[in-house]
């Protein structure tokens, strides 16, 4: 029996994608091979690779001014790869810190240049808000401004993306990419690990504006230098072939669902249902300001934290798993990515109400 999986990542996958991957495991479309066995330069995999690129460009409406790269290293890897690729001429960057992931980015970039904290969403309650553009105190002529547009751990999402003029905006969109339409033209660089909404762990999507491909530091490894990767169509080294194949299946699934506008409508409905259950309760609490609440990652706390393990055990008995909050903040967290069905959120809300009544 399949469960409702609320994991923050690796996360729930569309069942249709899993079934197709299973059907094609031993023999991809009459090739007599699994995708795992294909040469990354063979015509079979090249067709998979190109279709994935085309479908992702269509879904996100990526303009011709931007290149799409398939890399490795995950979001954390990009915390080093980004500064090494952009601090060649200007070894300085600004950061808007809204949670744990942008904190890690801020710290990692210090190895490659000077960093400046332009704004922080930290309050006495922890990271609970996305600072407005009017609060950003930018330094003089930084190489870029870094922003994590969705903080997976704290459940903080940035919805208003400012136009910074000539200053490139770099966004870690790992945990909400493909959950809603985005104006890619506003970003110099946008990246995301795959294991949330893109597919399985192993591939990292980097979308970079063409004019930013030639700004790398000399220490940047060739395999992670965006210019080299772009010139070789993400084939400079052996790419994560199976992860790209799975991502391609997810992209086609998203298009069948109606694209990102349709996914946004679903995600608004799911997240509203869950936040309403928290807000109308005296037993559950979410600390994030309403205008900054993530649609993908919903953390909540029980009024009586001694009941946490009881809550998790009861949820598991009802077929709902991976609800434990991150160890750094505690409580609960429901990650409701694209592949988590509305029925799963309804089941969770029903259980939350039942558990509250039993705890009264």
Swiss-Prot record:
Catalytic activity: O-phospho-L-serine + 2-oxoglutarate = 3-phosphooxypyruvate + L-glutamate; 4-(phosphooxy)-L-threonine + 2-oxoglutarate = (R)-3-hydroxy-2-oxo-4-phosphooxybutanoate + L-glutamate
Subcellular location: Cytoplasm
Residues modified to N6-(pyridoxal phosphate)lysine: 196
Intrachain S-S bonds: none
Subunit architecture: Homodimer.
Family designation: Belongs to the class-V pyridoxal-phosphate-dependent aminotransferase family. SerC subfamily.
Function, in words: Catalyzes the reversible conversion of 3-phosphohydroxypyruvate to phosphoserine and of 3-hydroxy-2-oxo-4-phosphonooxybutanoate to phosphohydroxythreonine.
PANTHER family in the record: PHOSPHOSERINE AMINOTRANSFERASE (PTHR43247:SF1)
HAMAP family given in the database record: SerC_aminotrans_5
Protein name: Phosphoserine aminotransferase
């Amino acid at each position: 029996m399949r469960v409702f999986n609320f994991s923050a990542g690796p996360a729930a996958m569309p069942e249709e994608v899993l079934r197709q991957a299973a059907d094609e495991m031993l023999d991809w479309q009459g090739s007599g091979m699994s995708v795992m066995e294909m040469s990354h330069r063979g015509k079979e995999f090249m067709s998979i690779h190109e279709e994935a690129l085309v479908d992702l460009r269509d879904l996100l409406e990526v303009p011709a001014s931007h290149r799409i790269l398939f890399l490795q290293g995950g979001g954390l890897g990009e915390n080093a790869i980004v500064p090494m690729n952009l601090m060649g001429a200007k070894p300085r960057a600004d950061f808007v810190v809204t949670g744990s992931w942008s904190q890690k980015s801020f710290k990692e970039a210090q190895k490659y240049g000077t960093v400046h904290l332009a704004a922080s969403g930290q309050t006495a309650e922890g990271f609970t808000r996305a600072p407005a553009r009017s609060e950003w105190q930018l330094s003089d002529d930084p190489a870029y401004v870094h922003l994590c547009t969705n903080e997976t751990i704290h459940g903080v999402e940035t919805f208003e993306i400012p136009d910074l003029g000539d200053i490139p905006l770099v966004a870690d969109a790992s945990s909400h990419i493909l959950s809603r339409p985005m104006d890619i033209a506003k970003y110099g660089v946008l990246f995301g690990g795959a294991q949330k909404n893109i597919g399985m762990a192993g591939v990292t999507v980097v979308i970079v504006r063409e004019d930013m491909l030639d700004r790398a530091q000399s220490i940047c490894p060739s395999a992670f230098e965006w210019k080299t990767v772009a010139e070789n169509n993400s084939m400079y080294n052996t790419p994560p072939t199976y992860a790209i194949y799975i991502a391609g299946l997810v992209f086609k699934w998203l298009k069948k669902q109606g694209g990102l506008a349709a996914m946004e409508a679903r995600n608004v409905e799911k997240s509203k249902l869950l936040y309403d259950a928290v807000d109308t309760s005296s037993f559950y609490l979410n600390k994030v300001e309403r205008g900054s609440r993530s649609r993908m990652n919903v953390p909540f706390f029980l009024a009586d934290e001694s009941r946490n393990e009881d809550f998790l055990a009861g949820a598991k008995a009802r077929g709902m798993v991976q609800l434990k909050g991150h160890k750094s903040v505690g409580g609960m967290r429901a990650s409701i990515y694209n592949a988590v069905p509305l029925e799963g959120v309804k089941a969770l809300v029903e259980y939350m109400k039942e558990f509250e009544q039993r705890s009264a």
